[in-house]
Amino acid sequence: MIFHQLEHVIGVSWVIQAAIFAALLLFAGGLLVRARVAGPRGGLLPDEGVSVRNVLEVLVAWLAGMARDRMGPNWRRYFPVVGTVFFFVLFANLIGLVPGFEGATGDINTTAALAIVVWVFYTAIGIIEHGSQYILKFMGPPLGKSHVHWLAPFFLILEIPLDLSRIMTLAVRLLANMFADHTVVAVWMTLIPIGVPAIFMGLGLIVAFLQAFVFALLTMIYIGLALEEPH
C-alpha cells in the first residue's frame, strides 16, 4: 500500500495521509466547480455530458432536499457541515477502491473522529438553540409538570449513555462496512487479478456511496432532533 510505504519515509501515519488525501480531493472538486461557476457563462448552464461539476451539483441538490426535510427551516445554516461530511466520507471510501491505496474510513481512528465531530456539532446546536432546556431533556418529562420528577436522576443515567452511544454506532457502522468491502476487493484482486475484481469494485462503488449517504442521513436526523423544541 502506497500510504503504508510513505509512512516509513515521512513519518506520518497512513491514516492521516489518507484523510488528508481525501480532503485534498474534496478541496480540488470544490475549486473545479467554483472555477466553472465563475466562468464566462456564469455557471448558469450545466456542462455538456457527464462532468465532475454536473455530478457534484446533482449530489448537492439531492442532499439539500433531504436536509430541508429533516432539519427544518434553518437547514441552510448547518448544511455546509453535512455536505462536507458526506463528500469527505465518500471520497475516503472511494480511495480505498483504487489499487495500491487504502481509504481512511477503514480505520477506527477516522470513523471515531468523524462520529465525535458529529456528536459535538449537534450537541452544540442543541445547547445554542435551547440553552439549559436541551440538557434538562435528558432528565425526562419537565420537572414542573410531572409527578414523577423524582425519577429524573434515573432518566439522566439512562439518556446520557444512549446519546453517547450514537458515537459508537456511527463509527462502528462505517468502519465495519468499509473494512469488509475493501478487504473483499483486495482478496479477489490477489486471487484473480483480471475480470472478477471489476465486479466487486462495482459493488464497492455502491457500498461507498451508500455508507456516505447513511452517515450524512444520520447526521441530519441528529441535527433535526437537536433543533426540536424540548418537551
What is each model feature region?
Residues 1-231:
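Selective transmembrane helix interface/packing segments
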